[in-house]
Each structure stands twice: as structure tokens, then as C-alpha cells.
């Protein structure tokens, strides 16, 4: 499969790497639409020491919508072809690499996949080009919740991301 590998400041390589194989507890997803995050731009321009969770040598990208392509023998809560959003913080079971889960790769292997934890179902009413923006949407929602608005109040979130 083809994958964008983050090598450091202004250095991304497109490589042919083996397609991951699904273990008993894993789910393999095929990316269908990805977007470029402000974090992607920041670490590309300024390097890995920007404070973002990025792994040099890791598969780049984290804003994506995907389809389930393979399911491990012990996994029962996903179906083949189901559209899913891989939650960057938990998709690889390594919170240090949330920005390098493989959004710009053909496939992502999600180890020990859990519904509504590492992978979230995406309703069909949301088009792919919008579904890949679930991650920045959740960031804005979290920011609004942290402001603890009360019923009837408004919350505005400003940002320069995607």
C-alpha cells in the first residue's frame, strides 16, 4: 500500500509499505477521504517539536473517514464495509502518536479495536468529504464544553485549523 511517512521538518515521503494484516482483536480500515489539519501543516513547516503528538517515521495524517476492510476473529461489533471515524488518540493505542495514525495511507490497522472508543460509526447521511472533518469538529465541541455554557447561552469557538 502507499503511505505518507512523516520524516521531519519539510520531509514527507510517499512509500510503498506492506498492507497491515489483521490480528484476532484488530480491525483494518481503508481510508476513503482525508483532510489536511493545521497540525499537519505546523509539523511539516516547523518540525516534530511543536508540541503536537507526532511520531517521526510514522504514517502521517489523522483527519479521515474510512471503511472497515478486515475484521479480526474476536471482533464482533463491526461489519465489513461499515464507514468509521478512527479517533486519533486511541486508534493506535498510543496517545503519543495521535497525529501519525495513517490518515494519508491507503489503510490503517486499528489494534484492539473498540466501537465508540478507537473507531466510531459514521451515519450515511454525512458525506465523506464532511465526515473526514469529524476530528476538528470534536475539538471545537470540546472547547465549547470546557466553557461550561448554560442552557440558552451561546458559545463561540475560534480557531485556525482545517
Residue ranges and their predicted role:
Residues 2, 26-28, 154:
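Residues that mark the start of a beta-strand
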Residues 4-12:
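Extracellular beta-rich ligand/substrate-recognition surface
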Residues 18-34, 48-90, 123-125:
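Glycine-rich beta-strand-centered segment in the early N-terminal region that forms part
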Residues 37:
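Short cysteine clusters
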Residues 40:
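Active-site phosphate-binding/coordination module
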Residues 87-158:
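NAD(P)H dinucleotide-binding glycine-rich loop of Rossmann-like/cofactor-binding domains
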Residues 161:
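Conserved glycine-rich cofactor-binding loop
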Amino acid at each position: 500500500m502507499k503511505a505518507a511517512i512523516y520524516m521531519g521538518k519539510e520531509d514527507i515521503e510517499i512509500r510503498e509499505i506492506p498492507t497491515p494484516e489483521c490480528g484476532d482483536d484488530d480491525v483494518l480500515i481503508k481510508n476513503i477521504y482525508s483532510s489536511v489539519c493545521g497540525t499537519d501543516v505546523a509539523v511539516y513547516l516547523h518540525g516534530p517539536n511543536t508540541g503536537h503528538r507526532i511520531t517521526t517515521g510514522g504514517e502521517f495524517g489523522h483527519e479521515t473517514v474510512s471503511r472497515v476492510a478486515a475484521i479480526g476473529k474476536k471482533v464482533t461489533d463491526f461489519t465489513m464495509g461499515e464507514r468509521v471515524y478512527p479517533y486519533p488518540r486511541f486508534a493506535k493505542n498510543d496517545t503519543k502518536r495521535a497525529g501519525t495514525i495513517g490518515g494519508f495511507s491507503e489503510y490503517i490497522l486499528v489494534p484492539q479495536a473498540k466501537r465508540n472508543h478507537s473507531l466510531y460509526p459514521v451515519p450515511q447521511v454525512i458525506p465523506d468529504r464532511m465526515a473526514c472533518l469529524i476530528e476538528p469538529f470534536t475539538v471545537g465541541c470540546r472547547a465549547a464544553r470546557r466553557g461550561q455554557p448554560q442552557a440558552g447561552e451561546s458559545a463561540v469557538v475560534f480557531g485556525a485549523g482545517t
